[in-house]
Amino acid sequence: MPSFFRALFSGLIASQLSWAAPSLLHPLEPRQQPNCNTASNRACWISGSYDITTDYEVKTPLTGVVRQYDLTLTQAENWLGPDGVVKEDVMLVNGNILGPVIHAQWGDTISVTVTNNLKYNGTTIHWHGIRQLNTNLQDGVNGITECPIPPNGGSKTYTFIAHQYGTSWYHSHFSAQYGNGIVGAIQIDGPASLPYDIDLGPLVLSDYYYKTADELVVYTQSNAPPASDNVLFNGTNINPANTTQGQYKTITLTPGKRHRLRIINTSVENNFQVSIVGHSMTVIESDFVPVDSFTTDSLFVGIGQRYDVTIDASQATDNYWMNVTFGGGGFCGKSNNPYPAAIIHYNGASNSHPTNKGVAPADHECLDLLNLVPVVPRSIPTSGFVAASDNTLDVQLSTTTRKWTINGSTLDVDWGHPITQYVINKSTAWPSTDNVWLVEEANQWAYWLIENDPTATGNALPHPIHLHGHDFVVLGRSPNVSPTAQTPYTFTSSDVSSLNGNNPIRRDVVMLPPKGWLLIAFQTTNPGAWLMHCHIAWHVSAGLGNTFLEQPSAFVAGLNTNDVNQLNSQCKSWNAYYPSKDIFKQDDSGV
């Protein structure tokens, strides 16, 4: 039978749309304003009450301000893309390949109405990294927290509080749909661990393919993923095959000033190494976690990860390349653009292209930085950890089905019957392919050992692992080796002594080394159904994910009638639509 997802492209209304660089960041109206956050003191937020040391998981400056946004999803064919190549099919947010920035302040309420004007596809929008404290039904994952928003005018208003601050992004969680363009940035203003003068806003880095995400999903079911056709910087770049087409992204610095730049990797396949010729970057935040500042010449940014950095405009007034490179012997991704780059332009310099290409940075080998020290500390017991069947997740690729499994099971959700609906109806009869792990105790550390196919006979791959609803701590990982070495490491009792529970790295996306292991833990303080998955689109599409069902009784007790009515109404609308198209079947994990 034809693919349901593939049906998106079978009857598009022809439209010849030209690409224009979107205006990403909309300034906030001067409502709630911090009264002590200045260029010389970014650590303060509200004098005497909230600053960089405030534990944002415990205390939030609720402002009463509602930031309202509207996102309208449409589709087009024969679309002229940012690098001058016409794409057969594309999906757009408010008419652009990159949606508007959702911009708020710490403690604001964010309300986003999503209207689905796609022709055949449902959709949901996930607010990546947003904790969704006690608002699990707003997490935007079809088959887990809700049913899809039906096409041809269906809508949903997502409402949640910005308990965290920093930088993130939103994207569709309907199959691999975000690879077709349903992506945008999130900026939540708050304190910072280092002073700066100018906030440059988000820099969205993304791989870019001329084929549709659907075509690539099918291709990767029996082949290694192809190189990306290009790499975009805030939705633009030149065409590597014809440099007269497209344009470089230009980031303007003011000489003598310190600038904050919010780097986001929204790719489906490519992990990036980022560097700037002649400049270092000072890291002040990773994902939504403020960290003690430190300086580096380059950053490894995995899919879904974010780094907020400061850049001092202390060099000669000129133009400089910002370069993206690929490490790990091709295991981190690759592109047909041999030199993906943007231009760092000093105000007052000419408009000519930089002349110094710089040198490739040291290879990060698809591994995260280890010197991320959270400003707000945590202490986690590690000495008593014992690996067991109820806390170990074994990731494997089936060589026969080409599906990914966790403990032998491939994720395959039912769009029309989300896990939350089972829980609300006091049923545990969800399908085994929902890959549900019950986490019932409150206010505990839940430890999870993730092992990446150490016994594989072929090559294992690194995976950017993302958890919804929580920041997790990274207590340890297998030794640092190149993915090309394919050295197997299995966690043993002797590894316990190497674990770090003294204010360890804390974030929501971390790289799982090939044939290695990773030990993470999260606090059970947020009831709901929370997806954990690889953020390589083809991997989660092929089943690499599971759901932690956390405190189900407390989750139900915390719901109100409006929450439940909205869930049931949306599922009713979706299930009225989906059977009417019964020749179009879900043919991947659904998320």
UniProtKB/Swiss-Prot annotation:
Residues 1-20 form the signal peptide. It comes from the Eukaryota. Glycans are attached at N121, N234, N242, N265, N323, N407, N425. Cu cation 1 binds at H126, H466. Cu cation 4 binds at H463, C534, H539. It is an enzyme of class 1 (oxidoreductase). Keywords: Copper, Disulfide bond, Glycoprotein, Lignin degradation, Metal-binding, Oxidoreductase, Repeat, Secreted, Signal. Its main location: secreted. Its cofactor is Cu cation. Pfam families: Cu-oxidase, Cu-oxidase_2, Cu-oxidase_3. Disulfide bonds join C147-C571, C332-C366. Its EC number is 1.10.3.2. Residues 66-189, 198-356, 416-551 form the Plastocyanin-like domain. It is found in: Secreted. It catalyses: 4 hydroquinone + O2 = 4 benzosemiquinone + 2 H2O. CDD domains: CuRO_1_MaLCC_like, CuRO_2_MaLCC_like, CuRO_3_MaLCC_like. This is Laccase. It comes from Cryphonectria parasitica. The gene is LAC-1.
